[in-house]
UniProtKB/Swiss-Prot annotation:
Domain of life: Bacteria
Residues binding GDP-alpha-D-mannose, per UniProt: R206, K211, L261, E298
Protein family per UniProt: Belongs to the glycosyltransferase group 1 family. Glycosyltransferase 4 subfamily.
One Gene Ontology cellular component annotation held by this UniProt entry: membrane
Record-level Gene Ontology MF annotations: glycolipid 1,6-alpha-mannosyltransferase activity; phosphatidylinositol alpha-mannosyltransferase activity
Protein name in the entry: GDP-mannose-dependent monoacylated alpha-(1-6)-phosphatidylinositol monomannoside mannosyltransferase
Source organism per UniProt: Corynebacterium glutamicum (strain ATCC 13032 / DSM 20300 / JCM 1318 / BCRC 11384 / CCUG 27702 / LMG 3730 / NBRC 12168 / NCIMB 10025 / NRRL B-2784 / 534)
Reaction catalysed by this enzyme: a 1,2-diacyl-sn-glycero-3-phospho-[alpha-D-mannopyranosyl-(1<->6)-D-myo-inositol] + GDP-alpha-D-mannose = a 2,6-O-bis(alpha-D-mannopyranosyl)-1-phosphatidyl-1D-myo-inositol + GDP + H(+); a 1,2-diacyl-sn-glycero-3-phospho-[alpha-D-6-acyl-mannopyranosyl-(1<->6)-D-myo-inositol] + GDP-alpha-D-mannose = a 2-O-(alpha-D-mannosyl)-6-O-(6-O-acyl-alpha-D-mannosyl)-1-phosphatidyl-1D-myo-inositol + GDP + H(+)
Xref: SUPFAM superfamilies: UDP-Glycosyltransferase/glycogen phosphorylase
Record's signal peptide: none
EC number(s) per entry: 2.4.1.346
Effect of substituting E290D: Reduces mannosyltransferase activity by more than 95%, and weakens but do not abrogate binding of GDP-mannose
InterPro entries on file: Glyco_trans_1, Glyco_trans_4-like_N, Glycosyltransferase_grp1
């Protein structure tokens, strides 16, 4: 790919700092020719950043502050990199606010500017001042990527009609997220203290109100009445944990808080479940919403049927053959769906197989990487 258009990725969200946008950029960049990529990123911890950057096969230039803002000083530094590295594309890893520097990128010689959205722009679009910022970004970038049809519907008018909108959600590593063999599933369940026939519901996410772990706990008395040995596994950490633990007091024998697991342990736990459920619900008058929900897709890749919430883009991750959708605050309906699936192993197996096929066909990193390559390597319109 010697003729590749060279891309400068400008971002505050880059490893070793942990987070969703950081993972999104890291994994998308890994699908590209490393010689075509330069990253310009902020620095949260200089020592950790230096050690991490040495492991990469593309160049990373660090802004020596923990936050990069679209100031004249930052814009000047970015422009220097564009000129010195003969950059063709500038890709703002998160559109707001750094893509306010899109005009400077063009003036410095970049012929195409791409900016990615991740869902928080929905909130920006609802506030007059920040909505004006989105319109300025929309008038200066060439391509805006979005993670779900829901987020696009919510903020498209704020950005205006100038940019091309491209669907670019995260992919799933279908080589790591795979259905468990019977032996591996049994071993994971034994480690958790379960048998091969224990009904297991898993939820893997940050512990925050939007994700719906509280609704799952509230549904457990009805589930336990139908299946007394049913177990709910809550994987993850967050500020809502103490509230959830108090809520689970009366069902503590059937609810296990596993905390944040190592990556492979998380996958093993997910693949050992009978159902993955995260009944996400929109909160804060529409400001607190599920942009997409990659965990639903990871569960499907593991061959596990899914119960998703109605919030934001969550319903877009499943098909009628692979998962069910429920209003996250409707505990009675949630418990009904959980019991129906736990009582029907044939249906669960069919949904799991369909889920795996769905993710392989539509959501793998190979597919998403090709989509990004087309965006970056196509000539400006």
């Amino acid at each position: 790919m010697s003729a590749s258009r060279k891309t400068l990725v400008v971002t505050n969200d880059f490893p070793p700092r942990i987070g969703g946008i950081q993972s999104y950029l890291r994994d998308f960049i890994a699908t590209q020719d490393p010689e075509s990529i330069v990253v310009f990123a902020s620095t949260q911890n200089a020592e950790e950043a230096h050690a991490y950057d040495k492991t990469l096969d593309y160049e990373v230039i660090r802004w020596p502050r923990s936050v990069m803002l679209p100031t004249p000083t930052t814009a000047h530094a970015m422009a220097e990199i564009i000129r010195e590295r003969e950059i063709d594309n500038v890709w703002f890893g998160a559109a707001a606010p750094l893509a306010l520097m899109a005009g400077t990128a063009k003036q410095a010689g970049a012929s195409k500017v791409i900016a990615s959205t991740h869902g928080h722009e929905v909130g920006w679009s609802m506030l007059p001042g920040s909505r004006q910022s989105l319109r300025k970004i929309g008038t200066e970038v060439d391509v805006l990527t979005y993670i779900s049809q829901y987020t696009l519907r919510r903020f498209k008018s704020a950005f205006g009609s100038h940019p091309t909108f491209e669907h670019l959600p995260s992919g799933v590593d279908v080589k790591r997220f795979t259905p468990a063999t019977p032996e591996d599933k049994s071993a994971t369940r034994k480690k958790l203290g379960f048998t091969d026939t224990t009904p297991v519901i898993a939820c893997n996410s940050r512990l925050v109100p939007r994700k719906g772990q509280d609704s799952l706990i509230k549904a457990m008395p009805q589930v336990i009445a139908a299946r007394p040995d049913a177990q709910l596994l809550i994987v993850g950490s967050g500020r809502y944990e103490s509230t959830l633990r108090r809520l689970a007091t009366d069902v503590s024998q059937n609810v296990k808080f596993l905390g944040r697991l190592e990556y492979q342990d998380m996958i093993n736990t997910l693949a050992a479940a009978d159902i993955f459920a995260m009944p996400a619900r929109t909160r804060g008058g529409g400001l607190d919403v599920e942009g997409l929900g990659i965990v639903y897709l990871e569960a499907q890749a593991c061959g596990v049927p899914v119960i998703a919430g109605t919030s934001g883009g969550a319903p877009e991750t499943v098909t009628p053959a692979t998962g069910l959708v429920v209003e996250g605050s409707d505990v009675d309906k949630l418990s009904e769906l959980l019991i129906e699936l736990l009582d029907d192993p044939i249906r669960r197996a069919a949904m799991g197989a369909a889920g795996r096929a769905h993710v392989e066909a539509e959501w793998s990193w190979e597919i998403m990487g090709e989509r990004l390559t087309n965006i970056l390597q196509s000539e400006p319109r």
